[in-house]
Amino acid sequence: MPKRGRVGLAESFQSKTKKQKENEYNAFQREKMERALANNARAAPKSSGMTFRPLTVPVAGSVIYSRPRVPQVRTNQMSTFVVNTELVANITLAAAGAFSFTTQPLIPSFGSWLANIADLYSKWRWISCSVVYIPKCPTSTQGSVVMAIVYDAQDTVPTTRTQVSQCYQSITFPPYAGYGGASALNHKGSGGESLVSTLDTNRVDKRWYSTIGNAAFTALTSIDKNQFCPATAIIAGDGGPAAATAVGDIFMRYDIEFIEPVNPSINV
């Protein structure tokens, strides 16, 4: 004889269809996730979009550069790839605390070594490109430096450090910062003290850019420069010592792809 009366929980669960069981399980998981998200939202502080990290520096510091291995050059049937790091600019704070800035167009002809390879190809694109600041001044040096990458050559030049600090992914730091991040010169996985601005290759306008030399690029209008240059690094500073002071070096760490070989004598 079948049992009569209330059905137990186990029997009730067993009598449900597979679809009903899946629906109940999914509903339970959704409710669990919603509770977790609600708890996280209550716990997370409001953010302005700014991040910071404290800086501790020695009384004196410096960086020794060496090149234990050659730049990496590899090829396939269609492209040539080059990986390297090279010095591209020196940064000096203007006298009497005045504002000053340096621009570094992110094109291969502005790397003195890379430019010679770029002359051999018609087109190129960055696989990755980063600008690294390495200090060369004592920790007693006063002032502030800001570094950012802008993606429109038509933008006018900055006149204040505030303007540069408002750019996408800008970094502001004292001129003596960055000793501990020298490993960023060699690879992407650098320490927390590195001062690096990295090109966002998803934001560039074109897939490929035509090769152009320094002189020809400098002579272009700002509108035309956008056809040859995906972005420009800006390094600016103010509040420096009474006399103009060299405070750091700018290195470009890159992985670049070239296509369409061409005779350098006809490459502009």
UniProtKB/Swiss-Prot annotation:
Q: List the disulfide bonds.
A: none
Q: Where is this region: R domain, interaction with RNA?
A: 1-77
GO MF terms on file? RNA binding; structural molecule activity
Could you tell me the superkingdom of the organism this chain comes from?
A: Viruses
Q: Where does this one sit in the cell?
A: Virion
Which InterPro entries does the entry mention?
Capsid_prot_S-dom_vir (IPR000937), Viral_coat (IPR029053)
| Residue ranges, annotated region (Disordered) | 1-21
Q: Name one GO cellular component term.
A: T=3 icosahedral viral capsid
- Leader sequence segment: none
Annotated Gene3D superfamilies: 2.60.120.20
Segments carrying the region annotation (P domain, projecting) are 259-268
Annotated spans, S domain, virion shell? 78-258
Q: Which UniProt keywords apply?
A: Capsid protein, RNA-binding, T=3 icosahedral capsid protein, Virion
Q: Has the keyword Phosphoprotein been applied to this entry?
A: no
Is the keyword RNA-binding assigned to this protein?
Answer: yes
Chief location of this protein within or outside the cell: virion
As for what it does, the entry says: Capsid protein self-assembles to form an icosahedral capsid with a T=3 symmetry, about 28 nm in diameter, and consisting of 180 capsid proteins.
Family in the record: Belongs to the icosahedral plant coat protein family.
User: Whom does it interact with, and what assembly results?
Assistant: Homomultimer.
Q: What is this protein called?
A: Capsid protein
